[in-house]
Amino acid sequence: MLSALFTALVVTSGCDKVRDRFSGPKTTFDGAAALAYAKAQVDFGPRAPGLPGHDKAADWIVAEMKKRTDSVSEQRWTQTTAKGTQLALRNILARINPSATQRVLYVTHWDTRPVADDDLNFGNKTQPILGANDGASGVGLFVALADYFKKTPPSVGVDLLFVDGEDWGSFDVDTAGNYPDALFGSQYFANHLPSADYKPLFGVLFDMIGDADLQIYQEANSVERAPEVVSRVWQTAAELGYDNYFIKEVGQAITDDHMPFLKKGIHVIDVLDIQYGPLPSNHGPGTLPTTNYHHTLQDTFDKISAKSLQIVGDVAVTLVK
C-alpha cells in the first residue's frame, strides 16, 4: 500500500484503551456483505497490473457498480513506471446522484502490490501479495456502500473512485512533488478530473480498513493540510461510539492516494490502519505490530473482519446523511 514514517522507538504513550466496546451496527450498512465482496476480490488472486487477476477484478467492480449506482465510467491509460515498464491501468468512477452540484469524494485503491517486499521470509519477497486488507477491504467497503446508498440515498452526490496502480513500486517523491513509481491512479485522476470545476466538499481515502484489530489514528499529512475534514470524520466516529477505533491522536505521515489530491487543493484525508498486525495492549500511534502483515504474503482473508468494515462503513454513510 504505501510508506510510513515510523518512529525508531516503540511509542506507548499511556494509551491503554478498552480494546473493544463494539455493541453492534449503528446503521443499516452491512459489514458482512462488505466482507463477502472483499472475499470476491481475494478469490481473483493477486491483482497487480499485468497479472490475470487484475482485469478480472476490474471487470467485476465495473459490473457490480453498474447494478448499484447511477453511472459508471473508466479512465484507461498506459503508465510508464520509473524503470520504464509499461502498465495498462484502469480507474473506475461510480457516481450516486451525478446531477448534484454538492459532492463528496470517496477513494480507495483496488490493485495489489506485485511483490511481498516486507515479508520476513526472503523466499517470499518477490511474490505478489493477495492484499485482503491492502486492496480488497476498500473494494468490499465501496460495493457495500453502493448497496446502502441505493436503498438510502445520501443528502449529497457521492463519487466512489477506485484507483489503480497505487501499490506498484517505490513511494519516493520527486522534486516536483510527483510520485514516479506509485500512486499512479490517484495522480492520473487528479490531473484528469471529471470537469474543470470539479471540487468536492471534502474527500476521504479509505485504505487498509479491514484489519480485525482496527486502530485508526489521524494521519499527519491530513491533519496538517485538511484539518477540518479530519475533525468532521473523527467527530462523526465519536458520535457513533467508535472513538476507541478512530483514535483522536495524530499518527504517522503516510504517502498514500490522498497526496495527489492535496497537491491540487482538493481536501482528501487518509483513513487507514497502518499498524496491520497484532499490537500490544498499551500502544500508541508509533507502535509497531508484533507481527507485520503489511506488504507480506500474510495479508490474507483471515486477517480482516466484518466488524471492522461495519465500523468504517457506519462512519462513511453517516458523513453524507
Each language-model region and where it sits:
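N-terminal capping segment at the start of a domain
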Residues: 20-58, 68, 285-303
